[in-house]
């Protein structure tokens, strides 16, 4: 059998630098969404602590939507 040689080429440094910036920008946007979600969940928790029975009745009347 003949010996096979394999060549491996590395990517250019410029492309890698651009790709590293993109996930960081996306992470910032994702953090904003999580913060909004946390605020909404805190509001729901507060409502349930004060008047859970009314919340459940209103949820059932709307058909769970």
Swiss-Prot record:
Residues 1-38 are annotated as: Disordered. Pathway: Protein degradation; proteasomal Pup-dependent pathway. Keywords: Isopeptide bond, Ubl conjugation pathway. Residues 21-59 are annotated as: ARC ATPase binding. The modification Deamidated glutamine is found at residue 65. Is modified by deamidation of its C-terminal glutamine to glutamate by the deamidase Dop, a prerequisite to the subsequent pupylation process. Residues 22-34 have a biased composition (Polar residues). Pfam families: Pup. Strongly interacts with the proteasome-associated ATPase ARC through a hydrophobic interface; the interacting region of Pup lies in its C-terminal half. There is one Pup binding site per ARC hexamer ring. Protein modifier that is covalently attached to lysine residues of substrate proteins, thereby targeting them for proteasomal degradation. The tagging system is termed pupylation. HAMAP family: Pup. Belongs to the prokaryotic ubiquitin-like protein family. The N-terminal unstructured half of Pup provides a signal required to initiate unfolding and degradation by the proteasome but is not needed for pupylation, while the C-terminal helical half of Pup interacts with ARC to target proteins to the proteasome. This is Prokaryotic ubiquitin-like protein Pup. It comes from Corynebacterium urealyticum (strain ATCC 43042 / DSM 7109). The lineage of its organism: Bacteria, Bacillati, Actinomycetota, Actinomycetes, Mycobacteriales. The gene is pup.
């Amino acid at each position: 059998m003949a010996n096979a040689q394999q060549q491996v080429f590395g990517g250019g440094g410029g492309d890698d630098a651009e790709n590293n910036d993109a996930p960081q920008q996306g992470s910032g946007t994702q953090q904003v969404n999580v913060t909004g979600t946390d605020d909404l969940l805190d509001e729901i928790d507060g409502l349930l602590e004060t008047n859970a029975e009314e919340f459940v009745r209103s949820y059932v009347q709307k058909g769970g939507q």
